[in-house]
Amino acid sequence: MCGIVGAVSTRNIVPVLIEGLRRLEYRGYDSCGVAVQRDGQLERARTVSRVADLDTQAQSSHLDGAIGIAHTRWATHGRPDTVNAHPHFSGDTIALVHNGIIENYETLREELKAVGYGFESQTDTEVVAHLIHQAYTYPSSATRGHLFASVRAVVKRLHGAYAIAVFARDNPDVVVGARAGSPLVVALGDNESFLASDALAVAGTANRIVYLEEGDVVELTREGLTVADARDHVVEREVKVVEAHAAAVELGPYRHFMQKEIFEQPRALGDTLEGVQGFAPDLFGPRAAEVLPKVDSVLILACGTSYYSGCTAKYWLESIAKIPTQVEVASEYRYRDTVPNPNALVVVISQSGETADTLAALRHARELGHTHTLAICNVATSAMVRETELRFLTRAGTEIGVASTKAFTTQLAALYMLALTFAKLRGHLKAEAEEVALRQLRHLPSALNAVLALEPQIIAWSEEFTRRENALFLGRGLHFPIAMEGALKLKEISYIHAEAYPAGELKHGPLALVTEQMPVVTVAPNDALLEKLKSNIQEVRARGGKLYVFADADTHIQSSDGIQVIRMPEHYGQLSPILHVVPLQLLAYHTAVARGTDVDKPRNLAKSVTVE
C-alpha cells in the first residue's frame, strides 16, 4: 500500500518519477502527487485521480526538475482529497512523502502547534514534514542546515511504521530517506540516484540496488549514498545488481493483470517446482537439516489469502506428516496471550514479505521464545526472508493484481512440500509414495492448463452471478479453505457479499439464507467426504437454492434442475486444492468484469498491506 519514488539527477526527473508511480499502482492508492525543486522553488502537482491524470497535470504545468519525490497514497489519516495527498510541504523549504502510520502524531502535532506551526491537512505526514523543518531551519537546532542529520534526529521521535523521502528547497543535491517497518530501496545509476518502495519502480533505469535495513536513514546524492543505521552509526550496505523486469507491469494480450496472473499459474508452479528431486530439508535452506528434525509442532501466521493457504497446509501437515499444526490470523496472534512452544516451527506466509501484521506477529513470536522460523515468500529481498531462520522462495513472479492468484497456488505447492518433508523425516513417507508425489507435482502445470480450458463455461456462470448481491461457498475438509478463498475473491473484486462455510455447518445457520436468489458455489472433489457433501447439496436443492458445483469427473454429480455442474478434468488427490481454486478465481474475475468494477485495483484495498 502506498508507493514512494525519489530521485536526484542532472536531468529532468519528472517522467521517471511518474513512470515509477505507474509501476507501483498495483500496491493500491486513492491519490497521488509529485514535487520538484525548480529555479530555487518547491513545485508540486497532486490529484485524487489516477497516475495518468497526474502525468497530464504535470505536463500541462511544465513541471520539471533534477531533484524530486513522488507518491501514491492509500488514505489512513484524513480522507482522500487533494489537501491530504502527498507530497506535503513545510513552509517553502521542506517537501516530504511518507508511507505508514505515525502512532504518536497527535502529541507531536500539539507540540508543533504550541510553537506556531499550522496544519493544512488531517494527515500524520504533515507532522513529520514540520518536525524536519524545525530541525533543519531553527537557529537553536543542533542540526540546522544539515538535512541528513535533521532526519536522523527526527526519526528518533517517531513511533510507528514508516518510510519517508524528503528534500529541501535550498539543497538541490540531496534526497534523504528513512525506513522503519515499511520497505525502501536505493537504486544507483550513472550520476543519479533513486529511492523507491520497490525496485520495480526504477527497473531499466538503475539496477544497482541497496536494500535498506530496519531503522536505516540514507542520504542520496548524484554520486552515491551514505547510510546511518538504527544506532546512528554510519554503515556500509551491500550493493546488489538486480534485473527487475519492467515487462512484469505490462498486460500483453490480457485485459487485466488478474487475468494474466491466473493464466501464468502453470508457468509459476513449474518455476517454483524446478529442480525439486525429492523432499529433503535443504529445500528450506542450509540450516533446515539441523532444525526440522527438532520440530514437534507447527504454528502458521498469515493474513488474507495467505492465511487460507495456511489453513490448507494444516490438513496436509496433520494428515500426511502427523505433526500438530495451529494456524493463526497474524493480526490477532500478537494481541492475545499464547503458550509458546520452543520446539515449534513458526511459518510465516506472505507474497510480498512486507505484510506489517505478519512481520509484527513473527517478531512477537520470537520475543516469546520461538527460535525456529520459516518464511514462505515470493520476494527474496523482503524483510520477512531476512528475518527468518529458514525460507522457501516461491517463483510466482511479480503479482500486480490486488487479488492474489499465482502467489496463492505457489504457496500451496511450497506448503505441500513442507508437509512431505516432515512426513519423510518422521517416517511417514515411503520411497514409493515420494515418487508418486513427485510425479503429481511435475504434472501440475499441465493439469492446470486443462482447468484453465474451462474458462468459457465459467464465463457463462459469471453472467448469472452479475445480477446477485450475495453468495454462499461450501467445501469440506481439505477444500473448506478453498471455499473461503473463493468467497474472498468474489467479494473483494466484484463487491458481491460472499461467505464460505464447511458444508456440514449448513443446518447450523447458513441454510436460513438459502433461497432461489442465493447462488451456492460448491467444491466437490472425489474424496472421503464426497457422500457427506452430496447430502449437503440435496439440503440446498430442497430449499430451492441454485447450486453451482465444480465436481471431479468421477463424482457422478450431474447437472439437473437447480444444479449446474462444471466437470474438473481429473481428481488429483491431496493436491486437488491447487486445481479447484483456479475456477473460483476465474468465476470471481469474470463476474467482476461483467459488473464493471476495477478488477486490478478494487476499492479500499491495497496490494501490499505495510501498515497495521
Curated annotation (Swiss-Prot):
SUPFAM superfamilies with a match to the protein in the record: N-terminal nucleophile aminohydrolases (Ntn hydrolases), SIS domain
Glutamine amidotransferase type-2 domain span: 2-223
Reaction catalysed by this enzyme: D-fructose 6-phosphate + L-glutamine = D-glucosamine 6-phosphate + L-glutamate
Molecular function in Gene Ontology: carbohydrate derivative binding; glutamine-fructose-6-phosphate transaminase (isomerizing) activity
Main location: cytoplasm
GO cellular component, one term: cytosol
Protein name as catalogued: Glutamine--fructose-6-phosphate aminotransferase [isomerizing]
Annotated organism of origin: Ralstonia nicotianae (strain ATCC BAA-1114 / GMI1000) (Ralstonia solanacearum)
